[in-house]
């Protein structure tokens, strides 16, 4: 049997981290079994579904590189298929017309709740549809079994059983003629030959209802794995108040897809004590049965740690492709300056996100408007004029503009003045970057370039001269 899984989001909002983890688990299981992965857009909620949400879901999947083998399929384009089956079910009695008014159903629900009963349809029209004019407003309900139970072995939660008496007759077609979610899902899984359904635990109550529909259609019943919810670090359900919950918000906040995928796979799944997983390792090691039943808490600090790891360990050329988006987003013109892979190599150790990296790289491409006041006050004093002037003279004569050559030049300048490296390096750092902290100033100057370095030293010397005159 060829394994086939699916990710089937509803386009009523953006792709959030819970959905992304579900997609990842479903994708990993398919790939680990040599199977196929299907993307299906469940857009039967015509009022809430939007093209913007569809685009965001696809953009999120593409950014994570969770590529699909089939799809995207859209349920709204398959209404004829669903309605054709519903008509067959009406003909042979597997479904029936229900003429109950909204007022009657509301009163029924209120009465059941008042008496402590579980709200459910009472089957009034189950055998009395002929008492109404055929063209009167109605819905179509599935004739659910009234005896026995539904039992299924969930890959995460073990054996689950529901008595059929707890399940009411689902509406499978609305008054406006639109088929409903629970019915469309079953037909889609049947037609698309889905073998395993991986989804959130909030769907557990839908599962027995859907299994009964599979059986009524004589369709194979897939296996199920219902994964737990993701909580915030305070133990509450993850929401917007915990920070980013949309996948693309993490892109905007400077995370690499590898970091988010690595983090998400560990939110409920583990392999020993291993923390870092490449995608190939995930595929090799992943299994549904190793998913935890317990809810997982989202920890942003852990995600930042992973992001820093991948910024440092991945090929700088690859990281640079993602950095380019942030440089453009922060309106940094990279046409004149070092290459972005060089920027990644310089700054990766010092940054947790690509947003930070882009911001910290600005002085490599643009002249800064002002020098940091605290850094200037401490390091651009009168005593710094001589080291800066001597360094400038040596830099002007330097033919080989490399990190190594610049390091030797700073050492030689300090030695000639009989001072420590810091007495030369710190004034140079503030002069060249405008900041009190940066990577090694030799590496920084190598990327800033000779012309800009000399101009910035001149600016610093002018600052010192003006400061001394004012004192």
Swiss-Prot record:
GO CC aspect terms: cytosol
UniProt binding sites for ATP: 240
A Pfam family the protein falls into: Anticodon_2
GO MF annotation terms: ATP binding; glutamate-tRNA ligase activity; tRNA binding; zinc ion binding
Short motif 'HIGH' region, span: 9-19
GO aspect biological process, one term: glutamyl-tRNA aminoacylation
Catalytically driven reaction(s): tRNA(Glu) + L-glutamate + ATP = L-glutamyl-tRNA(Glu) + AMP + diphosphate
Keyword Transferase in record: no
Record-linked InterPro entries: aa-tRNA-synth_I_cd-bd, aa-tRNA-synth_I_codon-bd_sub2, aa-tRNA-synth_I_CS, aa_tRNA-synth_I_cd-bd_sf, Glu-tRNA-ligase_bac/mito, Glu/Gln-tRNA-synth, Glu/Gln-tRNA-synth_Ib_cat-dom, GluQ/Sye
Family: Belongs to the class-I aminoacyl-tRNA synthetase family. Glutamate--tRNA ligase type 1 subfamily.
Name recorded for this polypeptide: Glutamate--tRNA ligase
């Amino acid at each position: 049997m060829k394994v086939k899984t699916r990710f089937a989001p509803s386009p009523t909002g953006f792709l959030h981290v819970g959905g992304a983890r579900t997609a990842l688990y479903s994708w990993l299981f398919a790939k680990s079994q040599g199977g196929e992965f299907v993307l299906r857009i469940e857009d039967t909620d015509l009022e809430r579904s939007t093209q913007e949400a569809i685009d965001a879901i696809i953009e999120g999947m593409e950014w994570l590189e969770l590529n699909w083998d089939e799809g995207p399929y859209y349920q709204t384009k398959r209404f004829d298929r669903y309605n054709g089956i519903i008509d067959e079910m009406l003909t042979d009695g597997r479904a029936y017309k229900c003429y109950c008014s909204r007022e009657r159903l509301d009163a029924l629900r209120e009465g059941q709740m008042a008496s402590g009963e579980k709200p459910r349809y009472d089957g009034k029209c189950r055998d009395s549809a002929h008492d109404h004019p055929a063209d009167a407003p109605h819905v179509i309900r599935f004739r659910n079994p009234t005896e026995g139970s539904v039992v299924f072995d969930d890959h995460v939660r073990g054996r689950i059983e529901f008595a059929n008496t707890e399940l009411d007759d689902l509406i499978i077609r609305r008054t406006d003629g639109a088929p409903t979610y629970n019915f469309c899902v079953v037909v889609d899984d049947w037609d698309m030959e889905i073998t395993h359904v991986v989804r959130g635990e909030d769907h557990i109550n839908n599962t027995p209802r859907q299994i009964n529909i599979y059986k009524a259609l004589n369709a194979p019943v897939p296996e199920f794995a219902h994964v737990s919810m993701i909580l915030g670090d305070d133990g509450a359900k993850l929401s917007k108040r915990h920070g980013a919950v949309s996948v693309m918000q993490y892109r905007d906040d400077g995370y690499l897809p590898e970091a988010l995928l690595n983090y998400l796979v560990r939110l409920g799944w583990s392999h020993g004590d291993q923390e870092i997983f490449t995608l190939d390792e995930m595929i090799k090691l992943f299994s549904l049965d190793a998913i935890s039943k317990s809810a997982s808490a989202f920890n942003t600090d852990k995600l930042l740690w992973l992001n820093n790891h991948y910024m440092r360990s991945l090929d700088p050329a690859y990281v640079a492709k993602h950095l380019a988006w942030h440089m453009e987003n922060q309106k940094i013109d990279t046409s004149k300056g070092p290459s972005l892979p060089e920027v990644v190599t310089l700054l990766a150790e010092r940054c947790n996100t690509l947003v930070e990296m882009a911001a910290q790289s600005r002085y490599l491409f643009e002249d800064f408007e002002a020098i940091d006041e605290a850094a200037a006050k401490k390091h651009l004093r009168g005593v710094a004029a001589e080291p800066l002037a001597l360094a400038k003279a040596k830099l002007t004569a330097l033919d080989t503009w490399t990190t190594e050559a610049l390091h030797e030049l700073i050492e030689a300048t300090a030695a000639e003045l009989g001072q420590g490296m810091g007495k030369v390096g710190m004034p140079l750092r503030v002069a060249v970057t405008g900041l009190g902290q940066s990577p090694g100033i030799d590496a920084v100057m190598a990327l800033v370039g000779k012309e800009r370095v000399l101009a910035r030293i001149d600016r610093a010397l002018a600052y010192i001269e003006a400061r001394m005159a004012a004192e």
